[in-house]
Each structure stands twice: as C-alpha cells, then as structure tokens.
Amino acid sequence: MSDPVIKRALVSVSDKTGIVDFCRELSLLGVEIFSTGGTLKTLQDAGVAAASISTITGFPEIMDGRVKTLHPKIHGGLLAVRENADHVKQALENGIGFIDMVVVNLYPFEATVAKPDVTFEDAIENIDIGGPSMLRSAAKNNESVTVLTDSADYAQVLGEMRAGAGATTRATRLMLARKVFALTSRYDRAIAAYLTGAAGAEVEGAAAGMTVSLEKELDMRYGENPHQNAGFYRLTDSEGSRSFGACFEKLHGKELSYNNMLDIAAATSLIEEFRGEDPSVVIVKHTNPCGVAQADTLVEAYRRAFSTDTQAPFGGIIAFNRPLDMDTAVAVNGIFTEILIAPAFEDGVLDLLMKKKDRRLVLQKQPLPKGGWEFKSTPFGMLVQERDARIVAVEDLKVVTKRQPTEEELSNLMFAWKICKHIKSNTILYVKNRQTYGVGAGQMSRVDSSKIARWKASEVNLDLNGSVVASDAFFPFADGLLAAAEAGVTAVIQPGGSIRDNEVIEAADANNLAMVFTGMRHFKH
C-alpha cells in the first residue's frame, strides 16, 4: 500500500503555537483545511484559507461549542478504511468525505486545575470531549490518517510531505499515533485524579487504588551519579497537577541536575515554614540544612545561617523568604553556591549574580503545593504516604517539666521544631537566638547525632550555653538529654512517647531544664 496523499485536514487547537505557519504551508501543498471556533478565526485573520467544520457536518456548533465535531461525517471520514470497498461505498452513500490529517491539541485541563483558585466549573469546562474523540479515531486509522498533537512535530511532517508528494511515511504516522494514545491516556488519568480529589470523600488510610500521571518536564544531565539516567516528571494525582514550571523559573545558569532538584525541594520545603515571618535564610547541602537563621534583615539572617557551618555552604543551595536585596547578594557572592532561590530579585542583583556563569538563579513564583501524597519507589513496589505537613502550634505543646519555658525559649523551641523535621533522622538540633548552632543529622544513634551537633558548634566557636535542643523522635534514654544539658541547653522540644519518658523528665527537672512534648514524631529517611 502506498502512503496516502493528504488532501483534507481538520485543525482545532487550544495551543496555537506555530499553527498559522503550519497551515499556510499545508495550503501551499494543496491541502483543504477545515477548522473550528477560535482556531478558524486565527487562521482566517492570518489570511490562511480555511472553512468551518460546519461545511462538512451541515450542522452548527451548539451548546457553547460543546458539540461541534461529534458527527458521523467527521468520524466516518477519519475511521473509514480506504482499502475496504464496503467502507468506501457507505461513505459515498452518506456523503462522507475522507479526512487525511487531524491537527488537535486538547483543552488545557492539567494547567487549569493546577491554578490555586480554580473552580470546579472551570475544571469541568476544560474537559475536552471532541478533541480526544477525533484524535483516537485518527490514531486508530493511522494506516491512512496523519494525526498531530504537538507543534514540535509540524516541521517533520511538512518535510515528509514536501519530499513525498504530499504524503507522510508509515513510520511517522505510527509514531504520531502512539503519541496520541499516550496523551489521551494521561489526559483521562488527570481528569479521574482531579474528580477523585473533588469528590471530597474521606478515606481511612491510603486509597486502595491510585491513578497517577507522569509526564516528562525536564531532561536531567544524569541521575544521582553520572552512570544513572534520569528525568524530571510533572505529576498529576487526586490532589491536582504538580510541576517544576508552575512553582519555579530558572533565570540563569547551567541545566539543573537530579541532585539540584532534590536540593531545591529540600530548601524550599524548609523556607516555606517561614513564609510571612521575619527575614529567613536556609542553606542546604545534600538535602540537609546546614544553616538556618532569622533576623531583622536578610543579610544578617544570611550571615548567621552561614556562621553555623562555614564549610558546608560552599557548593550549597540557599533559599530566602524575602526578595534578594543587594546587601545580601554581595555577601552571598563571596562564596561559590550551586543555586540561589528567592521569591524576587531586587534591581541590580541579577546583574551582579549572573557574572558567575555556573551559578543557577531560581525564581520561586508561588508557594509550594500543600499536602498531597509522597511516593517512594522500592525494587518491589511503591510506598505511598501523606506528606509530613502537619503544623504544631504553641497551644499544642505539653510542658512536662516543673519549669515552664520562657518566652525566648519558646520562640527558639518553635523555630527549632520547624527545622527539625527537614533533617535526616536521627536528628538533634541546637538553636539559639533563632539560629541553628549545631546540626546532628542522619546518625544511627541519637547520642551520636547529639555529639556531632555539639562538635559542629565548637568548630565555629558557637557557645551552646543558653541554647535549646530539638529531637525528631523521643529520647529512648536519659543519656541524650543529659548530653544536651552538659552542653548548656536550657530547654528541650521532643515528641515524647518513650516508655522511659518519666526517667527523661526527671533528668530534665534535675538539671532545671524546661521540656515540652509535641506528640508528633518527625522521622525523615
């Protein structure tokens, strides 16, 4: 069978990128173009010859455009097998002309439901019905019909048509058909996921079944290590669509790596804890915070965060909860950093920071999506859990010691607790004056984490006398608390829940420590 020459095309797109030039070329190749609604107007306004789909169907677009292509003369023209004599006969008897090309992309459902203020009505109106129907009909009949959903394919198709006397190759039609079914499958999963969330049904535990759609958004140079392939995928589930581009824009620097993406997630998840609060700075290395501070100015917050660990920030990631100003930019510019993330960059700051070509500058355009599910792959399946997004307020704290914490201690305890859950377990964190003084992360023994945190503080001459300590899980024995008391701690925040809580409380009282229980553990693995 020879490749069919394209004589008639149906064009209806929501994304009009390149469509005028593409259709102009089709017209020059002798293709008759039919279109709908806004696409038809766009083509006609640009001087491209195109007729309304109604000239094929003999029926107007009705119900606010909900019904325009759902017609036998459309789908018969797409699905007819050209080598089947009965199909050809029935087409002639019913006045059905063959349609050789479909150019359709769908209503932007995923982009619509990703908007924080989207209404249910807006979401429903952006569920495309006619588009997927035409795409599936055309893709099913890919022996005869060329179907395009992506403007990136326009050039290849035009090239083949010029070289092939108006026809595309079988290999290209098959490739394009595969893209259609991948698109419609993802589109339907996104709708199902949104409606699942919109239903508002209370589910005890994780749902028995989940529908998750992944679409590659960014290529990664490599994975965690150079021998590993990797990519970044936008995710759509029952909570909506989540993508890098919705939250961030890379303004400068090399392409982002797999490890960069992990660090961006870690840094911004932590800086979100301080949204709307005093100027705050988070410095992250290998997804662990190595310095966090709040102050009256951003530059002072940076200097204090940096002073927690003056080595780890080199090659690290820094996130700010305020627009990055010139004073802070000058201070940061003194060291090599992989990535700087801010909600805005004040005048002149980008000019200064862009002088270092290897540094990535990332604009955080909006807050991170709240809640949702967290997925972790294992060699034997997928773990799914709610994100650790619950907030502990001051009124949730239970004072378990004889001494109540002072206002200053309470402020530092709450500051420490916000940070603690973002550090790899086991975690011991020393805080003083709204600044991390010692970070003990990722140790198998809680006592070892405490020793490391104390050692890190001593390395940079930070005095732990008068500090507070946070532990991501309960102290199983009093030894960890006694080590903190020996370091000069005056107050403690921890979940509680150990069978030896009374022993730990007695040790706190014996050392005149104030201790509060949160009732919430924050393991992080």
UniProtKB/Swiss-Prot annotation:
Any keyword Transferase?
A: yes
Pfam families per UniProt: AICARFT_IMPCHas (PF01808), MGS (PF02142)
Which biological process, per GO, is one annotated for this protein?
'de novo' IMP biosynthetic process
InterPro entries tied to this protein: AICAR_Tfase_dup_dom_sf, Cytidine_deaminase-like, MGS-like_dom, MGS-like_dom_sf, PurH-like
GO CC annotation terms, alphabetical = cytosol
Q: List the disulfide bonds.
A: none
Q: Which GO terms describe its molecular function?
A: IMP cyclohydrolase activity; phosphoribosylaminoimidazolecarboxamide formyltransferase activity
The pathway it acts in is: Purine metabolism; IMP biosynthesis via de novo pathway; 5-formamido-1-(5-phospho-D-ribosyl)imidazole-4-carboxamide from 5-amino-1-(5-phospho-D-ribosyl)imidazole-4-carboxamide (10-formyl THF route): step 1/1; Purine metabolism; IMP biosynthesis via de novo pathway; IMP from 5-formamido-1-(5-phospho-D-ribosyl)imidazole-4-carboxamide: step 1/1
**PROSITE patterns in alphabetical order:** MGS
EC nos? 2.1.2.3, 3.5.4.10
Task: List residues of the MGS-like domain.
Answer: 1-149
Task: For this UniProt record, give its keywords in alphabetical order, as a comma-separated list.
Answer: Hydrolase, Multifunctional enzyme, Purine biosynthesis, Transferase
Q: Which reactions fall under this protein's catalytic activity?
A: (6R)-10-formyltetrahydrofolate + 5-amino-1-(5-phospho-beta-D-ribosyl)imidazole-4-carboxamide = 5-formamido-1-(5-phospho-D-ribosyl)imidazole-4-carboxamide + (6S)-5,6,7,8-tetrahydrofolate; IMP + H2O = 5-formamido-1-(5-phospho-D-ribosyl)imidazole-4-carboxamide
UniProt keyword Transferase present: yes
Task: Report which superkingdom the organism of origin falls in.
Answer: Bacteria
Query: Which family, according to UniProt?
Result: Belongs to the PurH family.
- Entry's free-text remark on domains: The IMP cyclohydrolase activity resides in the N-terminal region.
Q: What is this protein called?
A: Bifunctional purine biosynthesis protein PurH
Q: Which lineage ranks, top first, belong to the organism behind this chain?
A: Bacteria, Pseudomonadati, Chlorobiota, Chlorobiia, Chlorobiales
Q: Which gene is the coding source of this polypeptide chain?
A: purH
